[in-house]
Amino acid sequence: TPGKFKTALQVLGFSDVHEVAFGADVGAIAEAHHYAEKVATGELPFLLTSCCPSWSMMAKKFFPTIIDNISQELTPMVATARKVKQEQPGAKVVFVGPCASKKLEAMRRTVRSDVDFVLTFEELDAMFDAREIDPASFEEDGSLHDATAATPRSREDLRK
């Protein structure tokens, strides 16, 4: 569970854990505004979005005619990292996720001051193994910084 996972990370040496769903909410709301301003008004025929840096790089390289249709909003990783850095300026932010492409994203000039390290789940699992930490064996810690629970009720809410 997320609470057990948080405890295991703290035993490993992390001081706090934030759920990246917060950043996903921030991005979804920003992209909804972008959609309402550009697509709904007819300025753009469609809007593409992806949290995957590999997808974004591929689209820009092989489909340059659609660059204006690719959302430039922050990815969940970056939005969450910026929130953490804003609240805790001296914090070192480590993103943990399934994809090694996030390492490329973290090396971008505009991101490298926000995300200090990226670990894949496989790498984190190896760290747990090396320290003989079993996340399932810990007590539940329910205090995980989670999603915003922001749910706009209508398109009008998105335009505000």
Where in the sequence are the language-model features?
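Iron-sulfur-associated redox domains of electron-transfer enzymes in respiratory
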Residues: 1-160
